[in-house]
Amino acid sequence: MEAHRCGLCREAERRPVGEPFVFVKDSSPYKPNRWLILPRPHSTDGRLPLSKLTAKERAAFWRAAIGKARALWGDDWGLALNGDEVRSQCHTHVHIGRLLQGVETGKPLVVDGPAAIPVPKDGSGLWIHPQGKRLHVHLGEQKTETVLLR
């Protein structure tokens, strides 16, 4: 097997091959309240990671992330994918955390569910949170994880 460069790659490789997603507690001592979801395969690593998943895989990925977030923080959850320019790990991952109050900015895209979450095409990140029965998706930013409790 090819040697991979980051700790998240190694974490994914420790898991059974049949698991499509891996949940890990963020190992940073500065982020004690954060979790991460990673696709187990390395096929999504690198630039434009979500574009490398099929629509069905992406919907399942987002459903799993939202399920974990709701289990941890009820309706106060947020998900954040940092953009290509600021991502510090090569293995694709999304931050799962408690959404900070008062961070809603601009005009988010409002979607009905995980299957409708768009794929950033320009290397930017996105962050997502619930709004009633729908989701607010914020696009066009690089550093998105700052909307989550550390």
Model-inferred region functions:
Residues 1-150:
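HIT superfamily nucleotide-processing domains
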